[in-house]
Design a protein with these regions (language model features):
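Glycine-aromatic micro-motifs
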Residues: 1-158
Length: 158
């Protein structure tokens, strides 16, 4: 949703407006290289606010390449609601299996790009921060390497 990034990736793209995708939540999942990237996952009673773009066929091909379509992301038809309440049938990229099963934190630069996009388009960042918080909770907990040493020192483990 970052206007600067879209201008670079898709020179013909135009903002059509802010929209809400009901029945999905924002998530960060591993992109195959160990870094988290954004996707939407079905989840009742949730929503994702975002930006709807008008893109040319040329821009769609460029965006397909950037998004790793059809391997990393697939295209799914979704219904979004505009600020005026109008329902629109559109296409969204959604991460494919097995990638979407593995939570991963985004890089600082990637996250800043998303937050900048929110600011540029008047979208609240609360859902982005919630997705980060959920991702942190979904990650496997790392074992404390000092825990065993402390138990041994206290005579709890032999």
């Amino acid at each position: 949703m970052n206007r600067n990034q879209m201008a670079f990736r898709c020179p013909d793209a135009e903002v059509a407006g802010s929209v809400r995708l009901e029945g999905y939540r924002l998530a960060f999942r591993e992109n195959g290289g160990g870094v988290g990237v954004a996707t939407v996952l079905p989840e009742p009673d949730s929503f994702v606010d975002g930006v709807l773009w008008r893109i040319s066929e040329r821009d769609e091909r460029r965006l397909d390449h950037y998004e790793g379509f059809p391997y990393l992301y697939g295209k799914v038809p979704v219904t979004v609601t505009g600020r005026n309440g109008q329902k629109l049938e559109v296409m969204a990229y959604s991460m494919n299996s097995p990638y979407k099963e593995t939570p991963a934190m985004p890089s600082k630069a990637y996250l800043e790009g998303i937050l900048d996009g929110c600011r540029q388009n008047g979208i609240k960042i609360a859902s982005i921060l919630e997705a980060i918080w959920i991702t942190q909770r979904e990650l496997p907990q790392k074992a404390d390497p000092h825990k065993k040493q402390r138990r041994q020192k206290n005579g709890e483990e032999r």
